[in-house]
Amino acid sequence: MDLSKTRVIPSNALESGGSAPAGRRYGGVDKDERQRQRRDKLIQAGLAVFGEKGFHAATVRNVCHHAELTSRYFYESFESMEALFEGVYVHVSSELMRRTVTALQASPMVPDLLAETALRAFLEYIREDPHRARVALIDALTVGAGASRISNESNKDFARLIATFIEMLYPTLAADTGLDPIYVANGLVGSNIRIATVWVEEKCATPLEVVLRNMFAFYQASISYADARLKEAQASKAQPTA
């Protein structure tokens, strides 16, 4: 399977449709590219400010000061702080998906190894910059309906990724055991989110390997249960009929 085609929320999902004429060029950079660069600076500034202060304490002035841009350029790309937050969330989620898929592509197709690889990528991404986790795991639930919708779609994307691997590794699981890969996958995503949230709330004080071991336990239990149920199903099929 080509995992490069795994859907993520597009980075331009929150931009308005249609592109303006290129306009004048300065230093070899046209108008659209300059606007894109300013938008990227605001996204990075938003991540830093939201991650440090929290969404509800952050202001347009804080973000513009960090980005070294005037408020005119803020409103060029975002109609509100909520819109900026949604843009930051999309950036964080899309980058995590890309990193996860890249790591999985390099992993052997063995259930335990795949799970550990994906979880390590997730935890390392958080530890590199805990601001990402505050945006994605904590504030996203309180910003508004738009952020909640985007967060929910992102969680579904990661659940679909896990479900895809379950179906590849256990193609007869649903038929033989009644276990639904998408329900199992959503449960695993939920455990990831809760454990990661606790880790972030303690400022990542617990060593990553300890957090990984505890997060991985849910995957090991699911793998063991799936293996046991499949063996039971195979044994039942092998029994002679009367």
Label each PLM-derived region with a short phrase.
Residues 41, 49-83:
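Helix-turn-helix
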Residues 87, 102-131:
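Hydrophobic alpha-helical connector segments
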Residues 94, 146-171, 182-193, 210-213, ...:
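Amphipathic alpha-helical packing segments from all-alpha helical-bundle domains
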